[in-house]
């Protein structure tokens, strides 16, 4: 009987395979030692520092120890909760906090961070988290350290390394209460505006819905435009004060328009609407020119307009005649009348069915004493918009001639009376 043939086997030393899920021990101290040793060798030559950091990324685990890396570059060592150094013995003076407190030095440090994050893109998120943390630790830093961090943050916001959403950390209740947030914001915005300008700052703030929150840098009892304006103007940031004031005005305008439309749709008496608008004008320092534009827009949005050109003019005249007393209450200045004329021109141009209604609307408002001769003549002569001007000027030609003749007649009558 044939014996079953044995299969050949491989013999030799067996190696123990490492478990795939066995993770390397988290050891930030060893990482810290490597970075600090390297920084000690480079000294304060920031070009050399940037090169060292660039090269070290290939050998050290930046992804894992991002927080430790940024702690060292900013504070000189690992930070404990609250902002103190975790180990005061292991630290380096090649860091933001140990550097000179001036804009030029902070600009040089900003370049170090820029180069590092451009080289290792994955550090972007870690760096943002680090800055958010540092802002929450502000009370744990000295005034000089806060100033340096503020300048650096402003520069990094200006060049796009940081996103303006990091400013959320400044709204921390304790930081606000003790005035730390506002003082920090002064230095930050100064360096930010120095790098760019207020318009660029405004765009960045708007992107993260921070444009209307700057007053939250102060406690609730001091959250007024007046207080903000005084504080930042005295600190040399008049452009920021004006920006916030403008933002408040824009917000007030939107609120005014919304309320106006609601009052009109309810059919509130004009005297009540006029009283409300005048109070809002006074409270929010809104000009009559701005208000007349808002009222015009609100009046025109309260009705469903006929799509037929031959019918819309009649509908418009009927509708606007009803609202003439309201409009007349806010055309007490020549400039307001001119603003209204331009708004009418713009509306008639943008809404093609109204192209032939322009002259009829102007005549209606003239008869209703919403508009007077002088602004109409000025509009006709040189103050009109380019939009559809040939059409509208032609429409107005006969009426303007009539106005001029009427004006001449009244002048000659006045002379005869003299």
UniProtKB/Swiss-Prot annotation:
Keyword NAD: no
Region (Disordered): 1-25
Pfam hit, one: W2
Single GO BP term: regulation of translational initiation
Cysteine disulfide partners in this protein: none
Domain W2 intervals: 246-413
Positions with biased composition (Polar residues): 1-14
GO terms for cellular component: cytoplasm
Alphabetic keyword roster: Activator, Transcription, Transcription regulation, Translation regulation
Function: Translation initiation regulator which may repress repeat-associated non-AUG (RAN) initiated translation probably by acting as a competitive inhibitor of eukaryotic translation initiation factor 5 (EIF5) function. Enhances histone H4 gene transcription but does not seem to bind DNA directly.
Family: Belongs to the BZW family.
Full protein name: eIF5-mimic protein 2
Organism of derivation: Gallus gallus
Gene designation: BZW1
């Amino acid at each position: 009987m044939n014996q079953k043939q044995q299969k050949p086997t491989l013999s030799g030393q067996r190696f123990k395979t490492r478990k795939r899920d066995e993770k390397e021990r988290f050891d930030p101290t060893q990482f810290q030692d490597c970075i600090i040793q390297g920084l000690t060798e480079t000294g304060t030559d920031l070009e050399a520092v940037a090169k060292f950091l660039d090269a070290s990324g290939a050998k050290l685990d930046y992804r894992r120890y991002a927080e430790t890396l940024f702690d060292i570059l900013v504070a000189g060592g690992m930070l404990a909760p609250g902002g103190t150094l975790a180990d005061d013995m292991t630290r380096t003076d090649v860091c933001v906090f140990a550097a000179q407190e001036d804009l030029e030095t902070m600009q040089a440090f900003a370049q170090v961070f820029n180069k590092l994050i451009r080289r290792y893109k994955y550090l972007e998120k870690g760096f943002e988290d680090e800055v958010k943390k540092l802002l929450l630790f502000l009370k744990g830093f000295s005034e000089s350290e806060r100033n340096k961090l503020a300048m650096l943050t402003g520069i990094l916001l200006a060049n796009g390394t940081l996103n303006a959403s990091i400013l959320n950390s400044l709204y921390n209740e304790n930081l606000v209460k003790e005035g730390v947030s506002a003082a920090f914001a002064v230095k930050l915005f100064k360096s930010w505006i120095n790098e760019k300008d207020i318009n660029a700052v405004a765009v960045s703030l708007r992107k993260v819905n921070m444009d209307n929150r700057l007053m939250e840098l102060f406690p609730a009892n001091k959250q007024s435009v007046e207080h903000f304006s005084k504080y930042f103007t005295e600190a040399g940031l008049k452009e920021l004060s004006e920006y916030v004031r403008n933002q408040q005005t824009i917000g007030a305008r939107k609120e005014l328009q919304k309320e106006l439309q609601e009052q009109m749709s309810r059919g509130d008496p004009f005297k009540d609407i006029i009283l409300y608008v005048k109070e809002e004008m006074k409270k929010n320092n809104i000009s009559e020119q701005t208000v007349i534009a808002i009222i015009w827009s609100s009046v025109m949005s309260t009705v469903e307009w006929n799509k037929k050109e031959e019918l819309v003019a009649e509908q418009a005249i009927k509708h606007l005649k009803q609202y003439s007393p309201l409009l007349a209450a806010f055309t007490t200045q020549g400039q307001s009348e001119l603003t209204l004329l331009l708004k009418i021109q713009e509306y008639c141009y943008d809404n093609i069915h109204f192209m032939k209604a322009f002259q009829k609307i102007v005549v209606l408002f003239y008869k209703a004493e919403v508009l007077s001769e002088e602004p109409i003549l000025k509009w006709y002569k040189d103050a009109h918009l380019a939009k559809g001007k040939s059409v509208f000027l032609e429409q107005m030609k006969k009426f303007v001639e009539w106005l001029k003749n009427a004006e001449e007649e009244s002048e000659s009558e006045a002379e005869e009376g003299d």
